[in-house]
């Protein structure tokens, strides 16, 4: 939500608290009966924020309208990714510029979840990221990339970044953290 609703300064702590409360509420049905049809979508958060009856909650809900009912509603659906497959491929090429950063963060989060699950089962996870320099262009995805790159190896992950644009890759402020944690 910070990326969508936070603006240039991000969300305030009380706004994060409102979102946290709403998210806990919308997951009640899913936790009671964890089937795919009960998995909340972005519209459920939007509706919970409107029910909250608070000016800040209403402001956050208003910032979600484009992503819930508007032209950017790509993520207002249940996933079609089978997370049980041995091999998963995410393609965010067709996302517009406005959603690309969000898409990259969602993919990175899904990969991290897989690494975490596989660690418990003592299985190595190979992660190949093509056009890796694109993750390093945006501050939020660059910082997250360094964070997961450092943690991957401890958790049985084998990250591999691929790029044809080495110049952009090396220009990133975050590159030292990645190269320092690479073989």
Language model features with spans:
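A short helix-turn-beta junction within AAA+ P-loop NTPase domains corresponding to the substrate/partner-engaging
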Residues: 174-183
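P-loop NTPase motor domains
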Residues: 1-157, 161, 170-173
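Conserved H-loop
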Residues: 166-170, 178
């Amino acid at each position: 939500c910070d990326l969508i609703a936070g603006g240039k300064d991000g969300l305030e702590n009380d706004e994060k608290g409102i979102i946290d409360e709403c998210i806990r509420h919308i997951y009640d049905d899913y936790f009671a009966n964890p089937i795919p049809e009960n998995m909340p979508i972005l519209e459920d958060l939007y509706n919970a924020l409107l029910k909250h009856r608070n000016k800040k909650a209403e402001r956050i809900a208003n910032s979600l309208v484009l992503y819930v009912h508007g032209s950017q509603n790509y993520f207002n659906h249940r996933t079609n990714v089978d997370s049980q497959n041995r091999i998963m491929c995410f393609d965010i090429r067709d996302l517009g510029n406005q959603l690309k950063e969000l898409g990259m963060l969602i993919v990175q989060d899904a990969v991290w979840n897989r690494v975490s699950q596989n660690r418990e089962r003592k299985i190595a996870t190979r992660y190949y990221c093509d056009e890796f320099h694109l993750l390093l262009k945006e501050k939020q995805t660059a910082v997250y990339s360094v964070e997961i790159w450092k943690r991957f190896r401890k958790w049985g992950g084998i990250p591999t970044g691929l790029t044809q644009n080495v110049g952009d890759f090396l220009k990133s402020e975050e590159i030292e953290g990645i190269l320092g944690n690479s073989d």
